[in-house]
Amino acid sequence: MVTMKVGNDIYYVGVNDHQVDLFEGQYDVPNGMSYNSYVIMDEKIAVMDTVDAHFAEEWLGNVANVLNGAKPDYLVVQHMEPDHAANIENFVKAYPEVTVVANTKTFTMMENFFRGMDLGDRKLVVANGESLTLGKHVLTFVFAPMVHWPEVMVTYDSTDKVLFSADGFGKFGALDVEEDWDCEARRYYIGIVGKYGPQVQKLLKAASTLDIQTICPLHGPILTENLGHYIEKYDIWSSYKVEDEGVVIAYSSVYGNTKKAVEVLAQKLEEKGCPKVTVFDLARDDMAEAVEDAFRYGKLVLATITYNADIFPFMKTYIDHLTERNYQNRTIGLIENGSWAPNAAKVMKAEFEKSKNITWLDTTVKIMSSLSDENMEQLDQMAEELCK
């Protein structure tokens, strides 16, 4: 059972999850996850969100420990995804006089998740920009639709200057594991929120008018120092800007010939002093990391075989992950391989036809089964283009 003080009257009552192996059924989380929840102690007591269903007992214990015999007045629900909302019914059963605070869309979702739960008059529907006074703390609710669900709202406490940011500024990893914020926050953002850059930009614009000294997300650490760094990262990610100079090479290979081409290219790039080269075998490496790095760096090389007159399934999945997250403002090079009718480059290029501001390398490497002298020259030309 872990609780900690965040502000003068704000307490963390969340939990760490080291049981989960795949977050949302797809993201590898070797360091677990945190599901964050907070209590604001005032004349009126507010609890901010709940946690995953597997941790009901631990979370309710954390809340009770902070309440120390007091009764909560409000449960504020910012986001209805089950890792944050699964214990709403358990909470209202434990505290039958509590009022649930949410917006209209949230209450609609709540009815669908908790069929048969009747809140009666214990509902407070709030509008965008509306405030709730707890005593000395005043909470203002700011709607953030599609960051990353339609009902999402964030909450600003003007007294302690705290932004309860829902899934915004979250990251993979439990709080009892120390690790770099940028990497796992980027992988979390690109994977889960990446499609909704314009909506995040709108939220950042709204947040820029607030005096924020602490950010309390629903995943990951509470942010109290150098907030400009985190906000700058979110601005870069949500505007699809290049974060760092470098080249990502993502490939799929069956008999090793396409892999050999990738190894040759990577070596040439390093010899030419390319600032950063990362290589991903899409069949074996973490797909989410390969997607993350494609958004981090400015240049991408895709290498695959022709397969059933199409492209290899892992490459198709990878490109789908990129395009559905609005991949743009990047340079792409193509390497294709085939034994009789290679057309992978054509197929891959067509997959990006709706992507904005894509620059294609002049050089495309066309391999017929294995590397030829001409292919080696093409790889050298491709390396020259990538290192410009």
Task: List each model region and its residues.
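Active-site neighborhood of phospho(di)ester-bond hydrolases with catalytic His/Asp-centered motifs
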Residues: M48-T50, P72-M80, V100-N103, L163-D167, ...
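Short, charged N-terminal beta->alpha structural module
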Residues: A250-E271
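Active-site metal-binding motif and surrounding structural segment of the metallo-beta-lactamase
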Residues: E43, H54-V101
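Metal-dependent phosphodiesterase/nuclease catalytic metal-binding core
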Residues: V39, V154-C216, P221-Y251
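FMN-binding flavodoxin-like domain, especially the glycine-rich phosphate-binding loop
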Residues: L175-I215, H219-I222, V264-F280, A290-K388
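Short acidic active-site motifs
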Residues: N87, D286-A290
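Conserved beta-strand hairpin/beta-sheet module of binuclear metal-dependent hydrolase folds
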Residues: T3-V63, V154-D157, K161-S165, T258
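Metallo-beta-lactamase
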Residues: M4-N8, A102-V152, Y196-K202
